[in-house]
Amino acid sequence: MQRPQLSVVIPCYNEAACLELLHARVGAAARGAVGDDYEIVFINDGSRDDSWAVMQRLAAGDPHLVAINLSRNHGHQLALTAGLDLCAGEQVLIIDADLQDPPELLTDMRATMREQEADVVYAVRRRREGETLFKKMTAAGFYRILDRVTDTPIPLDTGDFRLMSRRALDAFLSLPEQARFIRGMVAWIGFRQVPFLYDRAERHAGTTKYPLRKMIAFALD
């Protein structure tokens, strides 16, 4: 089976209010980048709202959309891993469901990958709109501490928003770790990895899925 040029993988937890606009914007960005040769993979991570019902409705009207329903809430990193394991694209864009990371940057990220002959283009947050000073300070401190205690340097001010080649994704998927820290694991696999600066938008709807207590638990794992 021929692979699509692009997969867009999006883990979702209680994001029903974002999904229709997310689907429309991601679909438009994908078509602008690769025409009709793409897939969108939504992973419902045990949501308690109407996320799964919305996904099913959207998938019924869009052959490009694959909707995966996990049996319970497994957490963002495992949900994302499930989507990465099932996606088929030659390039894979990872993006969150809250629309803080603009899918419209896809074309420029692909151009960066091509021009710099990179296997990973990771998005670096230049500005973070709509976040409290406390959130910005705790996030900055958390990732700087995490960077100091890990063996592999992890780019600062990044999330999981990134574009990966198929060979980089296959290398990531070969790693056996059960406790998944995806941005750290991607940094570890090697290949040429380059930054892409962007301004992070406000969340479209809902609340953050990474409050301080979850960040602490994440670090302890």
Q: What does each model-found stretch correspond to?
A:
Residues F191-Q193:
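Histidine/lysine/aspartate-rich catalytic loop segments that bind and position anionic ligands
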Residues M1-T132:
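Structured catalytic core of nucleotide-sugar glycosyltransferases
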Residues L197:
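Conserved S-adenosyl-L-methionine
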Residues V66-L86, P103-M185, A201-L220:
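Acceptor/aglycone-binding surface of glycosyltransferases and processive sugar-polymer synthases
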